[in-house]
Amino acid sequence: MRKVAVFGKPGSGKSTLSKTLAKVTGLPLHQLDSLFYQKSGEPVAREIFDKAHEDILISESWIIDGLGPLGAFKKRLDAADTLVYIDLPYPTSYWFVTKRLLKGMFIKPEGWPEGSSVLKGSIQSYKMLRLSPSFWNDEFMAEVEGMAQHKTAFVIRSLSELKAFIEKHAR
């Protein structure tokens, strides 16, 4: 476990899991939202993102949390030796986004880009969740299963599995 890609729908616990893995393994954590978005909440220029992303991919070790542009996502999956796909039920993800929004009125969420609006980000998360079934689907799951033949892959489908994964890897 030297190059770890953590991905899934918005509000699935990626940041919490990634932070725990980074703390336990000592691997550097790169939260994609912090690379992709400026403090204003606007995306950085694509060339700037691509260069930063590529520099991380060629480094010796990393944990990258998030999705980002699809081309970059595919490169990340290819470069990773470990895939962690968090595929929680949609109602759970919607609840986590709502909870993050409500708590975000008082405390900045973990992994949230510095200076970015929690409200704008939450609205974007709701939009992404609405579109998610067109991407996070059986076809994508088949791709992950195919990659699992030459990589370590974990698919987490419930809160109890998420908790067990964190507890197991937090030792």
Where are these regions (language model features)?
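NTP-dependent small-molecule kinase module
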Residues: 24, 128-171
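ATP-binding Walker
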Residues: 12
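Walker A/P-loop
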Residues: 15
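P-loop (Walker A) phosphate-binding loop of NTP-binding proteins
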Residues: 9
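Conserved nucleotide-sensing/catalytic segment adjacent to the nucleotide-binding pocket
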Residues: 30-82
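A glycine- and Lys/Arg-enriched "phosphate-lid" helix/loop adjacent to the NTP-binding pocket
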Residues: 88-136
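Hydrophobic anchor at the beta1->P-loop junction of P-loop NTPases
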Residues: 6
